[in-house]
């Protein structure tokens, strides 16, 4: 028996990293929003790794922040260590990574939700999304409360019909001992949504007091802290070290002797796990030539002795896990506080979604995060942000925010999921982005804050700070272009001291910086009138000047890319009427329903020849609009 419990514009189902960003975006855009969590103690919980960012993931966090999301600000307030990764490589792959105090991270995010206007946080399990005539009408809780809503966003994480697996033990359950959500999947299936099943896992947690750090390599945080959020300032604080050790022959021996007890290798686990975050036993079996593997020992917070054993995710039995741990240098006496486990869960085929993250066939139903087949807090957060924005924009009668592959890593991620689908938990990587020199983490605000302001999520204080930074960068670049460096003896002597050839004729300082051995910082002595600019402005000026030629080439590639993206395909276009398209192409195009030729060209099973046919036919179609039954 159900009862009417209230009415909201948007319901967000789940309050993990996707749900938090979705709910905040929706509410901040002025629509009444309710977010449901099965347990309010689990809001923004970090059930796996205790960090935010990393390679490519740091880019996503910067982009979330640039659009007006919360993740970057939240980690800046709660980090216990911060490092910029890949600094020996080019700026395109520099990625910020911060170790989080897991409890403080979750507590602060929950408080932000609780104190946001238009946002209501409730503890309840949603068992049904009420859909009538392919349109969302409401949601029903396990306790019988019915909420009338105009849009709903699925952010269920790994909780749908989740099953914990440890050796030959398996039981229904969610991460960190929380209950699974067993009833919602069936409701979605009954609404025509295709459900699949994925697997992920997490390592053991061990007691800090039982670790011998003297046998490990200490990894300290950076001395100069770079914040995730463009709004954060002066966030330096005392940091806590992480440690690196390695597995060895004994660890390998333990795994091989017990591989028949691994659910991955004895047939107990049939679902697909993440390729780029394999379990430890999977590493041993897939890379038999490797004698050792990195193991990272990471603190989970300031006020806990729990340490995360990074790189040692496992579904082996508890007794084997303990032997495995104690074979690692520094962990000979390790006490396991939490067991590693694998978890299987229901998720959707993301090709059922539009690029707005709304279901193609269900008006008002959106989906974000691990529900869409992705993995990771950052991948979840950025999808939640886009789904929340687009749910609000839809209800306001506005066009959705669609980020292109040339706009953001978020655009790459969503396009990959929606256009290609995924056969395994999808992880963001820099190699997935064709235009990664343009999509750097340092220029996320320059790429996206204007968009965030236009839709109303970026408020005036942030926008004012953004325009000030943008102007400072542009003015400094213009100034450098107007400074002429002459071929005086003292100038050439200075350059030779930097192993750079002397000048034969005058050159602008902007052009001089382009030399491989020089940069904006080392030529300071040639620039007597240089003002003291913020470090982030100086970094941006240096990157733009040094890489201008490469950046220009990528911009030209983007222009070519846009030509295909601008060739729109009408929603009503019938591929079955097109002569010359292969059967596989017709089936794939009909399923994905690409919005333009660019997206069509990225669909697996659609060849360049199919695209050529499609381009010719679309021109004819546009000339003869209205003749839908005509064959082409």
UniProtKB/Swiss-Prot annotation:
Protein residues bound to NAD(+): 273-287
Keywords: Cytoplasm, FAD, Flavoprotein, NAD, tRNA processing
Predominant place of localization: cytoplasm
Record localization: Cytoplasm
Biological processes, Gene Ontology terms: tRNA methylation; tRNA wobble uridine modification
A Pfam match: SAM_GIDA_C
Taxonomic superkingdom: Bacteria
Ranges that cross the membrane: none
Binding of FAD, residues: 14-19
Cofactor: FAD
GO molecular function: flavin adenine dinucleotide binding
An example Gene Ontology CC term for this record: cytosol
Function text: NAD-binding protein involved in the addition of a carboxymethylaminomethyl (cmnm) group at the wobble position (U34) of certain tRNAs, forming tRNA-cmnm(5)s(2)U34.
Subunit structure: Homodimer. Heterotetramer of two MnmE and two MnmG subunits.
Family designation: Belongs to the MnmG family.
PANTHER family: GLUCOSE INHIBITED DIVISION PROTEIN A, PROTEIN MTO1 HOMOLOG, MITOCHONDRIAL
Protein name: tRNA uridine 5-carboxymethylaminomethyl modification enzyme MnmG
Organism lineage string: Bacteria, Bacillati, Bacillota, Clostridia, Eubacteriales
